[in-house]
Amino acid sequence: MTLGDKFPRYLQQPPVCGVVCNMEHNRPAETLVLPPRGWRITPRHALVAALVCWVGFAVTVWMVLGNQLGSFDSAGLQYFRAGPDAVPWGPPAVLEAVRDWTALGGVLLRNLFALITIAALLLVRLRREATLLAVTILSGWVVNTLIKSLVGRPRPTIVSHLAEAGGSSFPSGHSFNSAVVYMGMALALASLSARRGVRWSMIAGAALVTALIALSRVWLGVHYPSDVLAGWLGGMGWALTASAMLYRPARDLADAAAPAIEAATPGELTG
Protein backbone atom coordinates (compact mmCIF):
# COMPACT_ATOMS: atom_id res chain seq x y z
CA MET A 1 0.00 0.00 0.00
CA THR A 2 1.37 3.40 -0.97
CA LEU A 3 1.12 6.62 0.98
CA GLY A 4 -1.44 7.81 -1.55
CA ASP A 5 -3.65 4.76 -0.94
CA LYS A 6 -3.51 5.28 2.81
CA PHE A 7 -4.02 9.07 2.87
CA PRO A 8 -5.88 9.94 -0.36
CA ARG A 9 -7.16 13.31 0.91
CA TYR A 10 -3.70 14.72 1.46
CA LEU A 11 -1.84 13.38 -1.56
CA GLN A 12 -2.39 14.65 -5.06
CA GLN A 13 -0.57 15.46 -8.26
CA PRO A 14 0.88 17.70 -9.64
CA PRO A 15 3.18 19.31 -7.01
CA VAL A 16 1.75 22.24 -5.09
CA CYS A 17 3.99 23.08 -2.19
CA GLY A 18 7.20 21.42 -3.34
CA VAL A 19 7.43 18.76 -0.63
CA VAL A 20 7.89 15.59 -2.67
CA CYS A 21 7.49 12.07 -1.32
CA ASN A 22 8.80 9.15 -3.41
CA MET A 23 7.99 6.16 -1.24
CA GLU A 24 8.67 3.40 -3.77
CA HIS A 25 11.14 2.89 -6.60
CA ASN A 26 9.93 3.15 -10.20
CA ARG A 27 6.69 4.91 -9.24
CA PRO A 28 5.65 8.52 -9.89
CA ALA A 29 6.42 10.92 -7.08
CA GLU A 30 3.47 12.02 -4.98
CA THR A 31 3.13 15.45 -3.43
CA LEU A 32 2.00 16.37 0.08
CA VAL A 33 -0.50 19.18 -0.36
CA LEU A 34 -0.46 22.06 2.10
CA PRO A 35 -2.80 25.03 1.73
CA PRO A 36 -1.28 27.87 -0.36
CA ARG A 37 -3.79 30.20 1.27
CA GLY A 38 -5.87 29.01 4.16
CA TRP A 39 -8.93 30.06 6.12
CA ARG A 40 -9.08 33.55 7.57
CA ILE A 41 -11.61 35.00 10.00
CA THR A 42 -13.67 37.59 8.14
CA PRO A 43 -12.79 41.22 8.95
CA ARG A 44 -16.39 41.97 9.93
CA HIS A 45 -16.57 39.14 12.45
CA ALA A 46 -13.14 40.01 13.80
CA LEU A 47 -14.05 43.66 14.24
CA VAL A 48 -17.35 42.84 15.97
CA ALA A 49 -15.57 40.56 18.45
CA ALA A 50 -12.81 43.15 18.89
CA LEU A 51 -15.38 45.88 19.58
CA VAL A 52 -16.89 43.82 22.39
CA CYS A 53 -13.42 43.38 23.91
CA TRP A 54 -12.54 47.06 23.55
CA VAL A 55 -15.79 48.19 25.15
CA GLY A 56 -15.08 45.95 28.14
CA PHE A 57 -11.51 47.25 28.25
CA ALA A 58 -12.63 50.89 28.14
CA VAL A 59 -15.20 50.36 30.90
CA THR A 60 -12.56 48.70 33.09
CA VAL A 61 -10.10 51.56 32.51
CA TRP A 62 -12.77 54.14 33.34
CA MET A 63 -13.69 52.37 36.57
CA VAL A 64 -10.06 51.93 37.62
CA LEU A 65 -9.25 55.59 37.00
CA GLY A 66 -12.38 56.51 38.97
CA ASN A 67 -11.36 54.28 41.91
CA GLN A 68 -14.59 52.31 41.61
CA LEU A 69 -13.12 48.80 41.78
CA GLY A 70 -11.39 48.85 45.16
CA SER A 71 -13.71 46.30 46.80
CA PHE A 72 -13.68 44.05 43.74
CA ASP A 73 -9.88 44.07 43.55
CA SER A 74 -9.41 43.49 47.27
CA ALA A 75 -11.89 40.61 47.36
CA GLY A 76 -10.33 39.03 44.28
CA LEU A 77 -6.83 39.05 45.73
CA GLN A 78 -7.96 37.66 49.09
CA TYR A 79 -10.15 35.00 47.51
CA PHE A 80 -7.13 32.76 46.81
CA ARG A 81 -5.69 33.13 50.32
CA ALA A 82 -6.74 31.45 53.54
CA GLY A 83 -6.53 32.38 57.22
CA PRO A 84 -5.30 35.53 58.93
CA ASP A 85 -1.83 35.05 57.42
CA ALA A 86 -3.28 35.02 53.88
CA VAL A 87 -1.45 31.86 52.85
CA PRO A 88 -2.22 30.52 49.35
CA TRP A 89 -4.58 27.64 48.77
CA GLY A 90 -3.38 24.06 48.79
CA PRO A 91 -0.02 22.31 49.18
CA PRO A 92 3.27 23.68 47.79
CA ALA A 93 2.74 21.69 44.58
CA VAL A 94 -0.24 23.89 43.73
CA LEU A 95 1.88 27.01 44.02
CA GLU A 96 4.53 25.51 41.74
CA ALA A 97 1.87 24.53 39.21
CA VAL A 98 0.48 28.07 39.16
CA ARG A 99 3.98 29.49 38.71
CA ASP A 100 4.60 27.09 35.83
CA TRP A 101 1.32 28.09 34.22
CA THR A 102 1.99 31.82 34.57
CA ALA A 103 5.36 31.24 32.86
CA LEU A 104 3.43 30.48 29.66
CA GLY A 105 2.65 34.20 29.56
CA GLY A 106 6.23 35.24 30.28
CA VAL A 107 8.57 36.78 27.73
CA LEU A 108 10.64 33.63 27.10
CA LEU A 109 7.98 31.00 26.46
CA ARG A 110 5.40 33.08 24.63
CA ASN A 111 8.01 34.52 22.26
CA LEU A 112 9.59 31.11 21.75
CA PHE A 113 6.22 29.63 20.74
CA ALA A 114 5.59 32.63 18.50
CA LEU A 115 8.92 32.21 16.70
CA ILE A 116 8.29 28.50 16.17
CA THR A 117 4.84 29.26 14.75
CA ILE A 118 6.18 31.95 12.42
CA ALA A 119 8.90 29.60 11.17
CA ALA A 120 6.32 26.84 10.56
CA LEU A 121 4.07 29.20 8.62
CA LEU A 122 6.99 30.31 6.45
CA LEU A 123 7.91 26.68 5.84
CA VAL A 124 4.48 25.93 4.37
CA ARG A 125 4.50 29.15 2.32
CA LEU A 126 1.92 31.02 4.41
CA ARG A 127 4.04 34.16 4.38
CA ARG A 128 1.15 36.58 4.85
CA GLU A 129 -0.05 34.81 7.97
CA ALA A 130 3.52 34.66 9.33
CA THR A 131 4.05 38.37 8.70
CA LEU A 132 0.68 39.27 10.22
CA LEU A 133 1.49 37.29 13.36
CA ALA A 134 4.86 39.02 13.76
CA VAL A 135 3.35 42.48 13.21
CA THR A 136 0.49 41.73 15.62
CA ILE A 137 2.83 40.64 18.40
CA LEU A 138 5.26 43.54 18.05
CA SER A 139 2.55 46.19 17.82
CA GLY A 140 0.65 44.63 20.73
CA TRP A 141 3.73 44.85 22.93
CA VAL A 142 4.09 48.54 22.06
CA VAL A 143 0.41 49.22 22.84
CA ASN A 144 0.60 47.50 26.22
CA THR A 145 3.79 49.34 27.15
CA LEU A 146 2.24 52.71 26.28
CA ILE A 147 -0.92 52.04 28.30
CA LYS A 148 1.13 50.92 31.31
CA SER A 149 3.18 54.12 31.21
CA LEU A 150 0.08 56.30 30.88
CA VAL A 151 -1.87 54.72 33.76
CA GLY A 152 1.12 54.13 36.05
CA ARG A 153 -0.75 52.02 38.58
CA PRO A 154 1.44 50.50 41.33
CA ARG A 155 1.42 46.80 42.13
CA PRO A 156 -0.98 45.52 44.81
CA THR A 157 0.23 45.25 48.39
CA ILE A 158 -2.89 43.66 49.89
CA VAL A 159 -1.30 40.19 49.91
CA SER A 160 2.27 38.96 49.58
CA HIS A 161 3.70 38.43 46.12
CA LEU A 162 4.39 34.78 45.30
CA ALA A 163 6.35 35.55 42.13
CA GLU A 164 8.75 38.25 41.03
CA ALA A 165 7.09 41.16 39.23
CA GLY A 166 8.21 44.66 38.36
CA GLY A 167 6.92 47.74 36.62
CA SER A 168 3.44 49.19 36.55
CA SER A 169 0.46 47.00 37.27
CA PHE A 170 -2.23 48.11 34.80
CA PRO A 171 -2.92 46.44 32.49
CA SER A 172 -1.26 43.11 33.20
CA GLY A 173 1.53 42.52 30.68
CA HIS A 174 1.27 38.75 31.05
CA SER A 175 -2.46 38.89 30.36
CA PHE A 176 -2.30 41.38 27.47
CA ASN A 177 0.73 39.98 25.66
CA SER A 178 -0.19 36.33 26.10
CA ALA A 179 -3.66 37.07 24.70
CA VAL A 180 -2.08 38.80 21.69
CA VAL A 181 0.44 36.00 21.08
CA TYR A 182 -1.73 32.93 21.64
CA MET A 183 -4.84 34.28 19.95
CA GLY A 184 -2.69 35.50 17.07
CA MET A 185 -1.15 32.04 16.83
CA ALA A 186 -4.57 30.38 16.90
CA LEU A 187 -5.89 32.61 14.11
CA ALA A 188 -2.79 31.93 12.02
CA LEU A 189 -2.66 28.17 12.58
CA ALA A 190 -6.39 27.86 11.95
CA SER A 191 -5.56 28.58 8.31
CA LEU A 192 -3.97 25.13 8.10
CA SER A 193 -7.21 23.28 8.84
CA ALA A 194 -10.17 22.77 6.54
CA ARG A 195 -12.37 21.68 9.46
CA ARG A 196 -14.55 24.29 11.11
CA GLY A 197 -14.55 22.45 14.44
CA VAL A 198 -10.75 22.31 14.55
CA ARG A 199 -10.40 26.00 13.75
CA TRP A 200 -12.83 27.18 16.41
CA SER A 201 -11.42 24.73 18.96
CA MET A 202 -8.01 26.34 18.48
CA ILE A 203 -9.47 29.82 18.95
CA ALA A 204 -11.46 28.78 22.03
CA GLY A 205 -8.40 26.99 23.42
CA ALA A 206 -6.29 30.13 23.05
CA ALA A 207 -8.94 32.16 24.87
CA LEU A 208 -9.09 29.64 27.73
CA VAL A 209 -5.31 29.28 28.10
CA THR A 210 -4.81 33.04 28.26
CA ALA A 211 -7.71 33.51 30.67
CA LEU A 212 -6.05 31.02 33.04
CA ILE A 213 -2.72 32.83 32.66
CA ALA A 214 -4.51 36.02 33.67
CA LEU A 215 -6.10 34.29 36.66
CA SER A 216 -2.71 32.97 37.77
CA ARG A 217 -1.41 36.53 38.12
CA VAL A 218 -4.13 37.29 40.68
CA TRP A 219 -3.50 33.99 42.47
CA LEU A 220 0.17 34.95 42.82
CA GLY A 221 -0.79 38.34 44.23
CA VAL A 222 1.13 40.40 41.65
CA HIS A 223 -1.92 41.92 39.91
CA TYR A 224 -5.34 43.21 40.82
CA PRO A 225 -8.26 41.40 39.16
CA SER A 226 -9.01 44.57 37.19
CA ASP A 227 -5.42 44.52 35.86
CA VAL A 228 -5.79 41.08 34.35
CA LEU A 229 -9.35 41.67 33.16
CA ALA A 230 -8.25 44.75 31.23
CA GLY A 231 -5.12 42.98 30.00
CA TRP A 232 -7.01 39.96 28.70
CA LEU A 233 -9.73 42.04 27.03
CA GLY A 234 -7.18 44.42 25.54
CA GLY A 235 -4.96 41.62 24.24
CA MET A 236 -7.88 39.79 22.67
CA GLY A 237 -9.14 43.03 21.20
CA TRP A 238 -5.75 43.83 19.70
CA ALA A 239 -5.27 40.37 18.17
CA LEU A 240 -8.71 40.53 16.55
CA THR A 241 -8.27 44.13 15.42
CA ALA A 242 -4.92 43.30 13.85
CA SER A 243 -6.44 40.31 12.06
CA ALA A 244 -8.98 42.64 10.44
CA MET A 245 -6.97 45.82 9.92
CA LEU A 246 -3.36 44.71 9.41
CA TYR A 247 -3.86 41.80 7.01
CA ARG A 248 -3.40 43.88 3.85
CA PRO A 249 -0.29 45.73 5.11
CA ALA A 250 1.13 42.37 6.22
CA ARG A 251 0.32 40.90 2.80
CA ASP A 252 2.10 43.74 1.03
CA LEU A 253 5.11 43.41 3.32
CA ALA A 254 5.22 39.64 2.82
CA ASP A 255 4.98 39.99 -0.96
CA ALA A 256 7.80 42.53 -0.95
CA ALA A 257 9.98 40.21 1.12
CA ALA A 258 9.04 37.09 -0.85
CA PRO A 259 12.24 36.89 -2.97
CA ALA A 260 14.47 36.95 0.11
CA ILE A 261 12.29 34.41 1.93
CA GLU A 262 12.23 32.09 -1.09
CA ALA A 263 16.02 32.25 -1.32
CA ALA A 264 16.33 31.28 2.35
CA THR A 265 13.71 28.49 2.24
CA PRO A 266 14.45 25.10 0.62
CA GLY A 267 12.42 24.67 -2.54
CA GLU A 268 12.07 20.89 -2.49
CA LEU A 269 12.63 18.07 -0.05
CA THR A 270 13.00 14.81 -1.92
CA GLY A 271 13.07 11.37 -0.42
Model-found features: residue ranges?
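Transmembrane helix-loop junctions and nearby membrane-interface residues
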Residues: 63-67, 149-150, 192, 218-221
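Generic alpha-helical transmembrane segments of integral inner-membrane proteins
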Residues: 51-56, 112-119, 134, 138, ...
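N-terminal transmembrane-helix/juxtamembrane module of multi-pass inner/ER membrane proteins
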Residues: 3-109, 151, 155-162
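Hydrophobic alpha-helical transmembrane segments
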Residues: 44-49, 62-63, 111, 118-124, 130-135, 200-207, 217-218, ...
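Membrane-interface loops
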Residues: 70, 74-77, 81-84, 113-196, ...
